[in-house]
Amino acid sequence: MTGNDILLWDETLFKDLSVLEPDYLPEYFPHRDSQLNALRFALKPALRGMRPLNCLLVGPPGTGKTSAIMKTFREVEAHAPNVVTVKVNCQIDSTRFAVMSRIYRQLFGISPPNSGIAFRKLFETVVNFLVSSEKVLIVALDDLNYLCCEGHANEVMYSLLRAHEQYPGAKIGVIGIVNDASDLYCLDSRVNSVFLPEEVSFPRYEEGEILDILKDRVRYGFYPKVISDEVLKLVVSYVEKTGDLRVGIDLLRRSGFNAERKGRRMILFEDVEKAYEASKLLHLCRGISLLSDPEKQLLELIAKKDEIKAGELYKSFHELTQLGYTRFYGMVNRLQTLNYVDADFTGKGKRGRTRIIKTKYEAEDILNCLKKA
């Protein structure tokens, strides 16, 4: 290392560190044009003072669902002062009262009383305001499945979707955001008959798309020549392994800090590898924490075996949860989609092909994450 390669104490590799923050919303949103256009079309009636179309955004973690909502909401707010948009994180606001309180705060700028007010009264206050002010409300329920877990999904959805029947002039649209459509198993026929969403799919990013997106973050987040194409491709490979673009953005940030700590002007392979070792369990545990309780129970059963046949696994799962095969089958497919398990078919079963299921991570790592979840 020459003198020119050494980073001085008052120098930094980062041109704009905010570009590498998880909540950064880029001006340009590559490889999601069709999804953004579908959202814009669904929300277009709201700009004319009408109820928008309901939507369901479906895709694995880190595929741009929440960012697409935030970008579209910004556009709507900039062009339609009569439209109020609210994004609810259902991991945090997982009860009907918490959801309605979030909407109330967005409308009135203050929180409702913590006690002494019923859900129905809070809801009436919200809807009466919408009607009297002639505003359109669009509510995005991020991680909607958490309302299912808590048993509040049907009442929240039913109240919002049928508000116009009880309160003429109320105009409310609902956007559900889930990792898999099967997450909405809890919605009953009353809700499904009025939800009827436009489904917008967010598939995993492909290798070339990941590279494009991370190159943009590098261009605006770092000074020139801080990271080589070869090192960036290593970051891309880790994103492919996890299936979560947020992993790549976080790795760029951590790798930059590692290089600065060593006083280098460039990020090396070892900086990325060290960053991944330090953060991979954080990403794994974060993902597992988002699973429903039955999914966590199923993953634990799988992790406690080197590999297990689907029939044997279902028997153990049913004894533990009393859930049926349809739910079990959907959860196995979801865990496979999320890259937590392999569930390959083999021809060695008594009746032909059967599924052999095993974890894609070290079992100990998964079990440790489940303990923290």
Curated annotation (Swiss-Prot):
NCBIfam families: orc1/cdc6 family replication initiation protein, PRK00411.1-2, PRK00411.1-5. It comes from the Archaea. One of its GO terms (molecular function) is ATP binding. HAMAP family: ORC1_type_DNA_replic_protein. Keywords: ATP-binding, DNA replication, Nucleotide-binding. GO terms for biological process: DNA replication. This is ORC1-type DNA replication protein 2. The lineage of its organism: Archaea, Methanobacteriati, Methanobacteriota, Stenosarchaea group, Methanomicrobia. SMART domains: Cdc6_C. The gene is cdc6-2. Gene3D superfamilies: 1.10.8.60, P-loop containing nucleotide triphosphate hydrolases, Winged helix-like DNA-binding domain superfamily/Winged helix DNA-binding domain.
